Amino acid sequence: MPSDDVRSPSGKPGKPDSGVPRAALRRQLLALRGALPQRPAADAGIEAALAALLERLPVHRLGFYWPIQQEFDARGVVSRWLASAPGRQAALPVVSRPGAPLDFHQWEPATPMVAGHYGIPVPDGTPPLLPDVLLIPCVGFSGDKFRLGYGGGFYDRTLAALAASGNTPVAIGIGHEACRIALVPQEHDLPMDWVVSEGGVF
């Protein structure tokens, strides 16, 4: 399990980053993620920890993300999870319009994809699916499971909307241990139920 050390954008124990403006902190963390040493080993650690967690949880409909900007690529884990038991389904997010919660549409490894908003691939013509577990990419994350994203608020709005409809999913943040930071949550921030890094699950 990862320690609760405060980490700076250098990935080393350091002072809390709560005084750094979030936009600047995102830039630092994205640059750090893009230059991580031993990236294959780190990704293998995330993959193993995530696969084990998914087998522990009662997951039937798994929402995840198409990787951008050097995010951990969960497609391999999700593909193997789908194939390992009948009745499992997966879905990718679709932006219907800026400022709205995300929609999710069914995905399988052979699903045809088209470019969606921001050029991110989305499933082409598959039905909507309501996930009971969501894998959520983290630019940064804190020891108390708060997440720093890209600043668009899509996942915060989505989690809030799903909760309001009585369909609260289990939220699993995915990030690299070097991007663990001290983060003062803002009013709209919602903690993850779990966070997975190459250091383990907490």
Which positions does each model-derived feature cover?
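N-terminal active-site beta-alpha-beta segment that forms phosphate/nucleotide-binding
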Residues: 2-130
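Conserved phosphate- and dinucleotide-binding cores of soluble alpha/beta proteins
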Residues: 4-13, 100-202
